[in-house]
């Protein structure tokens, strides 16, 4: 572990880490966003989620391997710095920070919109501000308070999914009182299992892969737990059943109980199922659950941005002020920085929703894939090095190395290329490329400045300054 990590308090318990890892899987994308995938893919959406989930399982296994060797709040940014080069750590760290800053704004706006469902007269901007401030204070107080909030947010989501699965299976097989078995006729009765063709399933993977962003947060949190190797190992090994049960299982229930082309599935598949089986106030219940998912994501976003900025500051790749810790070991200035820029994005949504805010949202669109790609490449290089120098440090190992690592890299590159041919995603890919280019240029400026400072500090060696890699 990096020595500088000693400043962060190790207050996250195993139960916190377990729920943080679960929270990363269950988000609003499952409760709401899955409807568009089902509507465009049909029952084959189950395959889309399974294949995308498999890719994320591979990524998490690789990240778990590296985290068990070096559990740090910098996580994959630090690993990229060590394995690929400082430019990679700098670039992916700042891109990831930017991604979550925008996510915080999106979730604050989404949460405010849900609350307006019950309280119509409260302005959207005010509710967004209140939600952001409350969860900012939670994160500022201590890492333990972040963990507690995330624990209960996650518990609500887990209980909801488990209840949904139990009730769904009961209606499918006719175990529910007064019900007839629904069976699996809806899986093939409306044009077959792949009514829109295999190509729609592959397209679905491109859309679905973004729903899993957040699973990697547990590796960032590893730097603040007393037993990081055990926590990361458990989280990494359990990601398989979490994705299968929560995502694939839930989508299978939806397409089994309702025809895939039902209009109400597009709006909210979970509400559609609950209304279909006669659950009273289904919309109200799901609004509360989605609000919980949104607040969980907002809470995680505030935590994640602060720790990534803290890690960048440790490596002198961000202002050193973001390394300052409170008495409880919290990087307060790093948290406030994420909150500040996120609320600027909220203001942009109020004044310029179709230009500035849309640009910010689209420009962060493909960053998730870049993060996954960097994780895979870092693991490929680090694993080869560790096998030669310190093989006993490998407490967790990626399966079938290096074959599955190469396969994952190829799959991610394939998804990035396919985005260029999908009208609804082309802008996201292009704008993410623009933002990535800006960050890379910033690194070159940063490197040049560091070289100049080093030369000024060592005038004897000015003629042959050491160039950073």
From Swiss-Prot:
Keywords linked to the UniProt accession: Amino-acid transport, Cell membrane, Membrane, Transmembrane, Transmembrane helix, Transport
Pathway recorded for this protein: Amino-acid degradation; 4-aminobutanoate degradation
A Pfam family annotated for this UniProt entry: AA_permease
GO annotations of cellular component type: plasma membrane
Disruption phenotype: A transposon insertion in this gene eliminates the uptake of GABA and severely inhibits the utilization of GABA as a nitrogen source. Triple deletion of gabP, putP and opuE confers resistance to the proline analog 3,4-dehydro-DL-proline (DHP), abolishes GABA utilization and prevents use of proline as a nitrogen source.
Summary of the function given for this chain in its UniProt record: Transporter for gamma-aminobutyrate (GABA). Can also transport beta-alanine. Can translocate several open-chain GABA analogs (3-aminobutyrate, 3-aminopropanoate, cis-4-aminobutenoate) across the membrane via counterflow against GABA, but cannot transport muscimol. Also functions as a low-affinity proline importer.
PANTHER family: GABA PERMEASE, GAMMA-AMINOBUTYRIC ACID PERMEASE
Listed name of the protein: Gamma-aminobutyric acid permease
Upper taxonomic lineage: Bacteria, Bacillati, Bacillota, Bacilli, Bacillales
Gene: gabP
